[in-house]
């Protein structure tokens, strides 16, 4: 069991800033070297959305971590670990005025099966992570960015040809899972990332 007390956690927030176009500098036409346009006092005010880092509120994080590992006599083994977290600074999707929530917090667990000898080893790993708040802002405007729950299956192995030569391979995301990012609710899709299955030798 663990408890973390967080203070002055840095979060990004967005606010609108106005800019008087009439106060801008002259635009020079590079082909002629003359002013292509001049500011006009009647120009409309331009509004820009600025993303700024701010000190967040205090928060408390409680959680449990558990890890188990066992190796059998024949070289096979298993490893499992998991984390469960809870915080008093979680995102409320119905509160559009909320300016603080801890980012990156979520439950997760990993399961690994392996086989090892003096000459070679192979590992199969399954990883799962629950959805979490990545950011309280979006590039498209107001609202949080949430990464939905994700699972991944990986494999790796190696063979020692000699004391100085080893052959290695690794396969990432064997089941070709997608990463989904959304806004406040599940129908607010922001991004689908397909990194595909990847191999390295």
Question: Where does each model-flagged region fall?
Answer:
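Short, basic/aromatic-rich helical patch in the C-terminal catalytic core of site-specific tyrosine
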Residues: 66, 155-158
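Short, surface-exposed loop/helix-turn segments at secondary-structure junctions
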Residues: 136-145
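Membrane-spanning beta-strands of outer-membrane beta-barrel proteins
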Residues: 59-61, 106, 150-151, 196-198
